[in-house]
Every structure is written in C-alpha cells, then in structure tokens.
Curated annotation (Swiss-Prot):
Residues 7-14, 34-41, 60-67, 94-101, 122-129, 155-162, 174-181, 196-203, 219-226, 262-269, 281-288 bind DNA. The gene is D1. It is found in: Nucleus; Chromosome. This is Chromosomal protein D1. Pfam families: AT_hook.
Length: 355
C-alpha cells in the first residue's frame, strides 16, 4: 500500500503495473480527462493552504467546459486530497497532475478561486514603488499651495537648482565647462580660436611653423648635473647621433668642456706615491707605509734645504769675497750706523782733548 504512494515525477508509464490500479480507476470514472504531472501536496488537508507557485493557466477554461464533472468529483475530492497528502491512498480518484481549480470541497474551491485573483493583484518578486504617482500628487499640491505657479513653470524639468549657482545639472549632469565657451566663440568669430593658445609657449622657437619641435636625443636637456659620470655615459651612447646631426656637435662641445669631474673634500696627500706603493706592497701594514712616506717626505725636505745651503755656499765662493765678510760688513755697517753717534763723540772728545 505504501509503495503505491511513492512520489513519481514525469509522465506516467502507459504499461500499468499491479500497483497502478489508481490510474485505471480514474480512467474508468472520467475517460475523457487525462491528468499528468505531480499530485497536489497541500490540497484539502490544510484548509487555508491553497496552491503555491504559479497559478493554473487553463483553470477557467476547464470550469466552463466541464461543469458537470466538477459535481461528480466533489464527493470524492476531500478524501482523495487528504489521502494523497498522507501518502496512504491506494486508489485516489483524482489522479496525478495539477488539480482542477474547482476540485475538492468548498475550501478547495475557495482557494482555487482566490489564486488567480491574488496572482493578478500580487505579482511575483519585489513590489513596485509608486513614486511617480506620489511625486505627481506632491507637485500638484505644491502648485496649489504656492501662488507663484508661473515661476515654477519657467523652471526646466529635472533636478531643482542648487540655490546659489546654476550648474546646469538637470540637462547634462555636469556644470558649465570650458567647451561651451569655446563653442560660443567659434560660432561668433572663427578667428579668436587661432591666436588663443593655452599652456606654456614654446621656447627658442622662431615661430609656430619656423623650426621643428623637440627631437628626442639621449642627451639630457638643461643645466648639467654635478655628477659627470651619467652625463659621460649618455655622451658615449649618443656618438652615433652626433655623427648624424653635425649641427648639434657644436652645442655638445661646450657641454663636454663645461662638465668636468668636480672633486669635493680635502685632497689626499701624496696620492700618487700611495697608489704606486699599493700596487707593489701588500695593504696589510698601512701604518708603516704612512710612516715611510712621512720619513721620505722629511728626508726630501732636508735634502732640499741642504741643496739650498750648498748652492748659497757655492755662490759665495764664486764671488771671491767671503760671504761671511759681506754679512759682517753689512752687519758692521748697520752696527756702525747705530753706534756712529757714540763713536764719533768719543773720537771728537779724544781729538778735542789732544788738541
């Protein structure tokens, strides 16, 4: 008994098995009506349940064609619906498929009558908002309340003005921009567009059609940087372009002369000697190397002083007169000059005494 009530989907098979005596009974009762599809679930068992989902399409047509069949099936409608809902009906009288709108007792008929009407009133999905009608009513009320209806008629349809500045948002969604002004000028006079130029004017140009625009070369433009290494790299890479553009070589030559490796900081002492010695000597003993350099420098300085003394001595010997005597003469002269008064006084005194 329970095996007969198992849910079966799709079209029923034509070959009736022993458990499918319900279809034969339905065919015997109403041979003209052929029912297919799933049986009704909530029909008859729950009074206010009704049919869920899409409402029946051909319900009214079937009601008009077979009013007598409805009366015959009303008697067995409740029991069959309840048994189908409980899955314990051995021979349901209604059969499978979508039930009729008028099938079942008064409650079933009421549900069937309500479903098409409710489907029309209530549509599936989200209900629509009634904003247009409300806005129209509000506009009518505003016009009735405000005496200045002519002012509102002058306003364009769309978003109201911001209050201070009319940005023309209602039509375009954007404010008055630059293109509109250009359009007015072009409509009035075609000439103002040519001389009116925006942006930075071209520099070192004889005119708009005089010389060509910027020709991209690898050489940097403007004042060269302090670091000359990247500039030299650019110059090395652009030797081919310099050969092609002979006129630009004159401009590049002053850049080469101007840009020189700029040395900053304190120059290194005896850099050449240190570099030569570093190539020959290991760098494990820097202190001794520095001392040796200092000693060498001191010895060189002493040698220079000695050579100067020797040259001075040779000059004195060549003159024939001893330099020491010259120095003494010069010093003696100075001393005599300083002591002239004292010596002369003594001499005069002696002469005066002798006389």
């Amino acid at each position: 008994m329970e095996e007969v009530a198992v849910k079966k989907r799709g079209r029923p098979s034509k070959a009736s098995v022993g458990g499918k005596s319900s279809t034969a009974a339905v065919a015997a009762i109403s041979p003209g009506i052929k029912k297919r599809g799933r049986p009704a679930k909530n029909k008859g068992s729950s009074g206010g349940g009704g049919q869920r989902g899409r409402p029946p399409k051909a319900s009214k047509i079937q009601n008009d064609e077979d009013p007598e069949d409805e009366g015959e099936e009303d008697g067995d409608g409740d029991g069959s619906g309840a048994e189908l809902a409980n899955n314990s009906s051995p021979s349901p009288t209604k059969g499978r498929g979508r039930p009729k709108s008028s099938g079942g007792a008064g409650s079933g008929s009421g549900d069937s009558v309500k479903t098409p009407g409710s489907a029309k009133k209530r549509k599936a999905g989200r209900p629509k908002k009634h904003q247009p009608s409300d806005s129209e009513n509000e506009d009518d009320q505003d016009e009735d309340d405000d005496g200045n209806s002519s002012i509102e008629e002058r306003r364009p349809v769309g978003r109201p003005s911001a209050g201070s500045v009319n940005l023309n948002i209602s039509r375009t969604g954007r404010g008055l921009g630059r293109p509109k002004k250009r359009a007015v000028e072009s409509n009035g006079d075609g000439e103002p567009q040519v001389p009116k130029k925006r942006g930075r004017p071209p520099q070192n140009k004889s005119g708009s059609g005089g010389s060509t625009g910027y020709v991209p070369t690898g050489r940097p433009r403007g004042r060269p940087k302090a670091n000359a290494a990247p500039v030299e790299k650019h110059e090395d890479n652009d030797d081919d372009q310099d050969d092609e553009n002979s006129g630009e070589e004159e401009h590049s030559s002053p850049e080469k002369t101007v840009v020189a490796p700029k040395k900053r900081g304190r120059p290194s002492l005896a850099a050449g000697k240190v570099s030569k010695e570093e190539t020959t000597k290991p760098r494990s003993r820097p202190a001794k190397n520095i001392d040796d350099d200092a000693d060498d420098a001191d010895s060189a300085d002493q040698g220079q002083h000695n050579s100067k003394k020797e040259s001075n001595d040779e000059d004195r010997a060549v003159d024939g007169t001893p330099t020491k005597g010259d120095g003494l003469k010069w010093n003696s002269d100075g001393e005599n000059d300083a002591n002239d008064g004292y010596v002369s006084d003594n001499y005069n005194d002696s002469e005066s005494v002798a006389a």
